[in-house]
Amino acid sequence: MGVYRFTCRFYTECLGMKLLRKRDIPEERYTNAFLGYGPEDSHFVVELTYNYGVESYDIGTGFGHFGIAVDDVAKTVDLIKAKGGTVTREPGPVKGGKSVIAFIEDPDGYKFELIERGPTPEPLCQVMLRVGDLDRAISFYEKAFGMELLRNRDNPEYKYTIAMMGYGPEDKNAVLELTYNYGVKEYDKGNAYAQIAISTDDVYKTAEVIRLNGGQITREPGPLPGINTKITACTDPDGWKTVFVDNIDFLKELEE
């Protein structure tokens, strides 16, 4: 994230999120802001990070978008335009499907897909990442992370296939959308998008399962210095990073 205040205002005024909490770590020279549509202990949220003095980042070609479910895509797009936001795809049906969508960008260039959908407990509903081998990615997320394949769809006309992975139905939970573009085996990940965070009852057991299923542990399980929240981190076969956070420790962190 480049300009901290401007970006936070976009998320609250254009996307209707709430600033849930923020923390400044001057000794490490960064600031975090956590934004979403409900409390962190029960909702998927966005963590924005501002590194002191860094004004821009390279998003790369691998990260796709975040998905937000809204009642009326056209109305939301009008609001975003009125606030000075960037619309990169006007409202209309998705390629190869019937769902009404639009695409917008935040001030740092992150894309958001607005998805027309009825009332949902989880408006921040998707993260889309591109992968080089869809079958391999599906197998990894099923076996290493315990996700289920909710659905997949092949679009030969547009030369791509998607797979929706998650821990529950799409209309009630945030899901991971994996996209395979025909013939593309790898992507530039840039230096902007960092990771997804998932809660777990035991970071040590989680790390074992990930190792057994071909994941690379990039941070051994254990407490974080200073806050004592236990975490572990890994990368999937495509190099996408995920952090697993101890459930009880995380709830204690929110209480402080």
Predicted segments with their positions:
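Vicinal oxygen chelate
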Residues: 2-6, 40-43, 50-108, 132-135, ...
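A short, polar/charged loop-to-alpha-helix boundary motif
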Residues: 118-126, 249-256
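Short hydrophobic/aromatic beta-strand element in the GNAT-like acyltransferase core
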Residues: 32, 101-103, 111, 150, ...
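Active-site acidic/histidine proton-transfer and metal-coordination neighborhood
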Residues: 108, 113, 117
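Extracellular structured ligand-interaction cores
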Residues: 32, 63, 124-126, 162, ...
